Amino acid sequence: MADYKTIRGTSTFEYEEKRSRFIATAAFADTEEKALAVLNAVRAANRTARHNVYAYVLQNGHTRYSDDGEPAKTAGTPVLETIGHAGVADVIVVVTRYFGGILLGTGGLVRAYTAAASGALQQAELVSMRLVVDCSVRVSYAQFEQAQRIIAAAETRLDEPVFDDAVTLCWRMPAGQEGALCTALNELTRGGAEVEISEPQYAAF
């Protein structure tokens, strides 16, 4: 499964077109349930708004959008396309419109929804997501420093060691790269090291 980019947390951006206010909220959402929770929260915070247009793209390929009463293809579709052009996934963008009394026409609506969604995504912090595994191993105090060097020399994110009757080392690394590291640790400990490896998961790395 391929690495991908998403955003961290939530970002907002406001765009105005002929007195209509377009307030875009972009948020991380890696499931449909989380995406809809963001949508419902934005709706609840903007009960007097005319429209709450949204689109989301999940890493698994699932997408969804809504014009929420705007003319077809003038609102939800531009928001969805903006997410696609940004090259991100596991993202929902909700654009709340407060009507300003002047009709914008189809071209004006497309421009406004695109600008609002694009602004929110540009404000967001991008994060690279990789398929990773979390690993841990217990080694003796005599083996600790060399084991730590072996782990640190690989592409890993190494946590602080935990000291008790032995030393526990925990780290995160890209899935599929753990085999060589396990071999090196087994050689160091003469087969005494039992590396625990989690199921692969997507995480910032």
Language model features with spans:
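Short amphipathic alpha-helices in soluble, non-transmembrane regions
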Residues: 148-153, 180-189
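Terminal, non-globular segments
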Residues: 171-180
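Active-site beta-strand/loop microenvironment that shapes enzyme catalytic pockets
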Residues: 78-123
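Short glycine-/aliphatic-rich beta-strand segments at the starts of folded cytosolic domains
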Residues: 125-143, 169-171
